[in-house]
Amino acid sequence: MKENAEQKSGHVTTRRLLDMKQNGEKIAVLTGYDYTIARILDRAGIDVILVGDSASNVFSGHTTTLPITVDEMIYHARAVVKGVQSATSRAMVVVDMPFMSYQLSEEEALRNAGRIMKEHECDAVKMEGGSSIAATVRRITDAGIPVMGHLGLMPQSIYKYGSYKVRAQEGAEAEELMKDARLLEESGAFAVVVEKIPSALAGEIARSLTIPVIGIGAGVECDGQVLVINDMLGLNREFHPRFVRQYADLNTIIEDAVGRYLEDVRSGDFPSPEESY
């Protein structure tokens, strides 16, 4: 997005997020995967829209985030950016780098990050990992691409850990996570997501870093919160983890609307003369 457009619209930037942390303003993040929802989120005033690799789950029906590709992420990101640009152009758009798009080499990671940025004008990319990706984060940020980190429960490593349980509950893992958070900051990350870790640890990390710490299942002491929009809107009645607050029950609302539509079509009540030409 062009600088003059950012200035006119109050577009959220990495600098703005840092100011929010310093001023004690909480940062609100939601995932988004399409044009229509992105327009709604931007108009509602959301700070950051994360084009998450969770699209692999909620859009494609996979059981993990691993199958989604760079091309598919670009497809979703392009739609989200267009949605934001057609609304108020305020929200920052951050795009997940999918599994194996940055693990092979620094060069491959930079190429994919550059492609994601160039092909749809997003604001930043997000990567999972600590010390193992620190050099890659540095390489990408040195090229002018902002990077958001992700620690704690890392869905792309689900087969390594074997479960979605809370991470860093014991001293050694908690200490390692703290070191990784500091290392990501030193490597140039502008923010870091911490997922499903003890709230006390998340608060300690937030206080020890100068960059924003965004929590998901990590307690209220983080600098901001992120949720998958499908979860907080109640679109999947079978999935309701402890850390999700459900703000609507769209599953029931949509089922009811479809049921009434079916009834009206089959009875001949729809379309009415007023709805016909």
Curated annotation (Swiss-Prot):
Originating species: Chlorobium phaeovibrioides (strain DSM 265 / 1930)
EC number: 2.1.2.11
Recorded family membership: Belongs to the PanB family.
Subunit and interaction comment: Homodecamer; pentamer of dimers.
Residue sites binding Mg(2+) per the record: 53, 96, 128
Cofactor note (record): Binds 1 Mg(2+) ion per subunit.
Annotated gene: panB
Keyword set includes Lipid metabolism: no
A single cellular component GO annotation: cytoplasm
Pathway named in the protein's UniProt entry: Cofactor biosynthesis; (R)-pantothenate biosynthesis; (R)-pantoate from 3-methyl-2-oxobutanoate: step 1/2
GO molecular function list: 3-methyl-2-oxobutanoate hydroxymethyltransferase activity; magnesium ion binding
Class in the EC hierarchy, top level: transferase
Protein name: 3-methyl-2-oxobutanoate hydroxymethyltransferase
Lineage: Bacteria, Pseudomonadati, Chlorobiota, Chlorobiia, Chlorobiales
